[in-house]
A protein has these predicted regions:
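Conserved N-terminal catalytic core of the sugar/cofactor nucleotidyltransferase
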Residues: 1-12, 20-22, 26, 34, ...
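Conserved core of the sugar-phosphate nucleotidyltransferase
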Residues: 122-198
């Protein structure tokens, strides 16, 4: 299990409605749906395969109704300490990028920031990821994928990201749901620019396209290839994963 050498903010936006699960009769909210005996969000955090010591600022953003319904003290054991933060929202936002900005006062600084989806798992070497992160302003873990269900990063010959597109296949490198920034303040800056320009995909402000504003500003964004990515985001995805 990897120990972090530097401080880092790790943020999980989990403030959606999970309506597709609700429509199919699931009674738990998506992050708390059982995945082989543990809540989905626990599987996602444990998938990092990291020791969460005082070098981490762990932040979760959830709906107030979910915080009231579930016992968040389970995260004491999952994370291994009680120094994490929970930001509660009264209602859903207009997309995950806007949700993450609700923690602006925590992440708008020079600390590295990694945001991660609450419904994706990966096979990867996280130590190699963080070694690579030291060389870039941002890094996007990716896997080889196809179809328009994912977001994609297109790179130049030198390996730097040229463009990121949400729900549109512009390459065969699909993003794995984890997004690293060497400074959290960069994410805040470029996410706010994207929202100010009202640049949406299917009506929402997604996280992956924020890198486009960083690229336009001359930031060096790299791609880190993971071995495999598993989506748990829909009832069909979850069943496929559990049966795999």
């Amino acid at each position: 299990m990897m120990k972090m050498k530097q401080t880092c903010n790790i943020l999980i936006p989990m403030a959606g409605r999970g309506s597709r699960f609700e429509e199919q009769g699931y009674t738990d909210k998506k992050p708390f749906i059982d995945v082989n005996g543990k809540p989905m969000i626990q599987r996602v955090i444990e998938n990092l395969n990291m020791e969460f010591d005082s070098n981490y600022e762990f932040v979760m953003i959830c709906l107030q109704e979910d915080f009231d319904k579930y016992d968040f003290r389970i995260f004491d054991d999952i994370i291994g300490h009680t120094e994490y933060k929970v930001v509660c929202l009264e209602d859903v936002t207009e997309g995950a990028a806007q949700t993450i900005l609700q923690a602006k006062d925590i992440i708008d600084n020079d600390k590295p920031l990694m945001t991660m989806n609450s419904d994706q798992l990966v096979d990867w070497d996280v130590e190699k990821l963080f070694e690579m992160c030291e060389q870039f302003d941002g890094v996007i873990p990716c896997f080889y994928g196809d179809g328009n269900a994912w977001s994609y990063a297109r790179t130049l010959d030198n390996g730097y990201v040229q463009e990121v597109a949400e729900k549109k296949q512009i390459s065969n490198t699909a993003t794995a749901g984890y997004y690293y920034w060497s400074k959290g303040s960069d994410f805040v800056k470029y996410a706010e620019q994207m929202i100010e320009e009202n640049s949406r995909t299917n009506g929402e402000f997604y996280v992956a396209p924020v890198y486009n504003w960083a690229v336009l500003d001359g930031k060096r964004i790299g791609v880190f290839m993971v071995d495999k990515c598993y989506s748990l985001g829909t009832p069909e995805d979850l069943k496929e994963y559990l049966n795999g």
